[in-house]
Amino acid sequence: MTIEHSNVGERYNPRAREQKWQAIWDEKKIFQITEENCREKYYVLEMFPYPSGRIHMGHVRNYTMGDVVARYKRAKGFDVLHPMGWDAFGMPAENAALQSKVHPKTWTYQNIAVMRGQLKQLGLSLDWSREFATCDVAYYHRQQMLFLDLYQKGLVARKVAKVNWDPVDQTVLANEQVVDGCGWRSGALVEQRELAQWFFKISDFSEDLLAGLEELEQWPEKVRTMQKNWIGKSQGLLIRWALKSTNGADEVCEAFNEVVCYSTRPDTLFGASFLALSVDHPISQALAQKDKALSAFIENCRCGGMTTAALETAEKQGFCTSLLAVHPFNPRIHLPVYIANFVLMDYGTGAVFGCPAHDQRDWDFAHKYDLPVQPVVLPKGSDAEDFVIAETPYTGDGVMINSDFLDGLTPQEAFEAAAERLEGQMLNGQPQGKRTVQFRLRDWGISRQRYWGCPIPIIHCAACGVVPVPRADLPVELPDDVTFDQPGNPLERHEKWQKVACPVCGQSAKRETDTMDTFVDSSWYYARFTAPWAQEPVDKNAIAEWLPVQQYIGGIEHAILHLLYARFFMRAMKLIGYVTVDEPFKGLFTQGMVVHETYRDDQGWVSPAEISIIEKDGKRQAHKLTDQSEVTIGLIEKMSKSKKNVVDPDDIIASYGADTVRWFVLSDSPPERDVIWTESGVEGAYRFVQRVWRCVVLSAPVLKEVIPCTGHQGAALELSKAAHRMLCTVEDDLEKFAFNRAIARLYEFLNIMAPLLNKIASVEDEMKASLRQAMDFFLALIAPIMPHLAEECHAALGGKTLICELPWPVYDPALIVEDCCTLPVQINGKKRGEVTVAATASEAMIEEAVLALDFVQAHLVEKSIKKMIIVPQRIVNVVL
């Protein structure tokens, strides 16, 4: 293939050049994995997008990071799998059908077409031959196979359960999908309902999922901690309390003469001042049948949401019953029994005792209902007579006080002593205490009352009951002829689709109308990418080659949703026999967001495209372009359509090119932190693109005829040392995801190279050879981040192959011994940046390097240098 390059005399035109190189990559199928490849495997994957309509800058940053890793690893000699697909089921498509009268399938595939084109504009090194959408029949067919496999292994259950019901979306939500008591998509206040639901038995893997976190050394500690807390293993005691009635509850006491509480702090029993039961506890239900006020209280609690997250933020509320609980260590102490909104029935036993002195939730409750607060843990070094609990509970360590036989013990010692005493005491013929382990993790409810999801392959027969769809009858396809003229699930109104013969008895039966939670779709897609053409859900040979994913990239918001479900699915697939490994993702990187200033006027939010910003008297001012009216500059926040602080990637690519966008989103801050989008930052990246091209333009006539070689003496040797050090440090930065540091080093090295390239015609042959090697290194290192520019420059210098097909350069360890120094550069006494020069550089060499810096040049647009103060190996101050 003949590779043409730009006329070296022209300004670099990113749009034309980028399209050219993308076409060449596509034609040669550079990034497509074939079975003939036999090098070491490396699987890099970014969380695939929901096809909402257009990509945003968060997508750009996420996928650019993954692409840098993919291109770097490919150059390092790996066979790299870097696929792309679409997380395509979900409520937004149905909402669009309701609002715009567009079928969800049409809406989804139209959006995919647009977003695919946008992603291709970025020059991502993706294997598009493996592309699929989770709404493709071929994909959800295999997902239904997996459901049947899980069903056969006993990992699927159908049971009536209280569920989180979103009254707007009219569907069930998992606990993780309820945020502050509201639906994560609709924002509606979640209600509690009892429905027959399908569950995946993720709780069977609680211990294994917890233990597996210790092996995930390449995961952020924060994510591992979040999952550990969500799984929520605790070691505690089941404590049985005798019940007494004050009045009106004698019948309840006959049926329930005791209540069992679960506690991780039996050491604090002498500080207990109340018991609290869940609104769903059998005792609560029995009392409510005879007490209308209690019944109303329970209904009110349910309307506020009953998830852990909702209850943590809700005001603590209780209803005092006529029951009293007898203290297990002192029968003369009787504690009031409350029905409380903060106790969950599905954790522990649905009953707790409250120790207000040493627990914030209990203190809040006791403070509201004027209950006693008795401290039983004394901080070390404190005086028991003076110690009181005032505004906040004491939750630290210490020694036990006011606790009878536990006094003087540490809380840990008191736990054991209390447990032993309770295990030896009897109540109604059984020990009053029993050690147990509890997990917070609950089974995953996957039933959703909506159309646009994977149909659950189940048939309901009046004679045979619940019957799985035979594997040979799959897929159960979604019907296209549905209506969206009202909320709810259209499948429930589609009698023709529902009607089916029972595969066991042949009688008329009905299909399951619930579809699967969309998190099921994303829980195994990474495995399907290894062989998306396989007839079974996965190809075992491909799985063995590629899994686990070496590097997974996505947002930390998925720590206890997608990431935990994917870990469960991997274990379930191992149990079925599809895979041999436990974990889906060996390495995980969670990137920060792209954020932007917000702007407002009297009419509301204003977009960045509608304003101009000037600096006046040291302050930035914003005005509307249309009428020059003043606009208030607000906080820097996550880009969102609602606040209009979004920047369309298409517009930026059209103006500056994809390489500029890729370079900027990685250059401005560490990748795990948020990056602030600024027009000046993008313009700076664009200037760098043009500067690189100018350097190539000036040097190409000479360098294209030069064979690269390491310098052996003088300035040529110093340049080679700098080039090899750059190669070593940038390689280390890329391995550590320190993309911003790598970019900073590339800026610095161009500052070293540029003055020499400007006088290329007059330098000695040894320097020319050293410069050619340095330029080759430089282009190889910018290629993962700015692939189009690197290809164009490589071709301009006479390259006969694609730079993306070249191996990563190798540095000489003998040349990376540190003999450079980095000097802070001040302008009028204020630090503006740094310059790296040889430790032995003369003042003239330092001055030349400083004058070549972009930020120095920017300050010289309207001003001139009065003097430059250089303290060798210390500092440079430019006085304007």
UniProtKB/Swiss-Prot annotation:
InterPro entries the UniProt entry points to: aa-tRNA-synth_I_CS (IPR001412), aa-tRNA-synth_Ia (IPR002300), Leu-tRNA-ligase (IPR002302), Leu_tRNA-synth_edit (IPR025709), M/V/L/I-tRNA-synth_anticd-bd (IPR013155), Methionyl/Leucyl_tRNA_Synth (IPR015413), Rossmann-like_a/b/a_fold (IPR014729), tRNAsynth_Ia_anticodon-bd (IPR009080)
The reaction(s) this protein catalyses: tRNA(Leu) + L-leucine + ATP = L-leucyl-tRNA(Leu) + AMP + diphosphate
Residues that bind ATP: 641
Key words, A-Z: Aminoacyl-tRNA synthetase, ATP-binding, Cytoplasm, Ligase, Nucleotide-binding, Protein biosynthesis
EC code: 6.1.1.4
Primary location class: cytoplasm
Keyword Transmembrane: no
PROSITE patterns: AA_TRNA_LIGASE_I
Locations listed in the record: Cytoplasm
Superkingdom, natural source: Bacteria
EC supergroup of this enzyme: ligase
Sequence motif 'KMSKS' region, location on chain: 638-642
Span(s) of short sequence motif 'HIGH' region: 49-59
Entry GO terms, CC: cytosol
PANTHER family, per database record: LEUCINE--TRNA LIGASE, MITOCHONDRIAL, LEUCYL-TRNA SYNTHETASE
NCBIfam families named among the record's database cross-references: leuS_bact
Name of the protein in its database record: Leucine--tRNA ligase
Source organism of the structure: Bartonella quintana (strain Toulouse)
Gene that this polypeptide is encoded by: leuS
